Design a protein with these regions (language model features):
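Conserved class I S-adenosyl-L-methionine
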Residues: 1-45
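Conserved Class I S-adenosyl-L-methionine
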Residues: 48, 171-174, 179-258
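Class I SAM-dependent methyltransferase SAM/SAH-binding core
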Residues: 48-95
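A short acidic, Gly/Pro-enriched loop at the edge of an enzyme's catalytic core
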Residues: 96-104
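A short beta-strand submotif of the Rossmann-like class I SAM-dependent methyltransferase core
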Residues: 106-107, 115
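A short glycine-rich, Lys/Arg-flanked "PGG" loop and its adjoining helix->strand segment in the class I
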Residues: 118-128
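Conserved catalytic/acceptor-binding region of the Class I
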Residues: 128-200
């Protein structure tokens, strides 16, 4: 197992907190994805079910794969009343589809899937003409003073960790943006009909919940415990009572060409 994949398997340590503080995804995103490609849907790296719940609420049939047993347990509880959701405890790299899917989607996790096999596996899981939808949330403090204090604490205790301090920073919703993400992620030629969407929103959380949010991110999970405690303690002392966050959700679409 590579270092990247080890880092991608730390979320189960804080599965319940992850489910509590991680943001969901816009309802508009699910509508846009399902307008692009229909079910049945295969979800890769479902986590605790933030995206699963969104898509399941539309009535589409979802097979949700999640490699971490602790995360999958929360996912199963979250979707227990959804007969259209099947939870499978498996890494995508090891999952053997029993049928072809009209849609494969992945929220916040495609970068953890083995680069050597992920596109081949996606093509094998999709029916000809089936859609691939990859999306990520990025959030950062809306207040420059909060950002300055955030950066100062990181510089002191964890200078090698880069907190989110700004937007995604690439063209979205344009032909150039579609070409860029395909090139950046090594999308093979059997995928085409590219598209991108960007959804902007905001939310305000307590400083404690903002620190809890950071604690669910892999770059903080792998810190030494004393470093993490010093960093988070300083943030709790300096950020004030609440943190306003800007949120961007980037969606990338591709179709498995017949």
């Amino acid at each position: 197992m590579t270092t990247q994949r080890i880092q991608g398997r730390v979320f189960g340590e804080v599965a319940d907190e992850y489910d509590r503080v991680r943001p969901g995804y816009p309802a508009e995103l699910a509508a846009d994805v399902l307008a692009y490609a229909g079910g049945p849907a295969l979800e890769v790296g479902a986590g605790t079910g933030k995206a699963t719940e969104l898509f399941a609420a539309t009535g589409v049939e979802v097979v949700a794969t999640e490699p971490d047993p602790a995360m999958a347990a929360v996912l199963a509880r979250r979707t227990a009343d959804r007969p259209n959701v099947t939870v499978t405890v498996s890494a995508f790299e090891e999952y053997v589809p029993q049928r072809a899917f009209g849609l494969l989607y992945c929220a916040q996790a495609w970068h953890w899937v083995d680069k050597e096999v992920r596109w081949q596996r996606a093509a094998a899981a999709l029916a000809p003409g089936g859609g691939l939808a990859l999306f990520w949330n990025v959030d950062w403090p809306a207040d420059e003073g909060v950002t300055a204090r955030l950066l100062a604490a990181h510089e002191r205790f964890a200078p090698h960790v880069r907190p989110n301090t700004g937007p995604i920073g690439r063209p979205i919703g344009e032909e150039a943006g579609a070409r860029e993400w395909a090139r950046e992620m090594g999308l093979p030629p059997e995928f085409g009909d590219l598209g991108t969407r960007l959804y902007r929103s905001g939310r305000t959380v307590s400083a404690a919940d903002y620190v809890a949010l950071l604690s669910t991110q892999s770059s903080y999970r792998i810190l030494a415990e004393d470093v993490r405690e010093n960093l988070f303690g300083t943030l709790l002392d300096t950020l004030g009572e609440q943190v306003a966050l800007n949120v961007e959700t980037a969606l990338y679409l591709a179709r498995h060409l017949p």
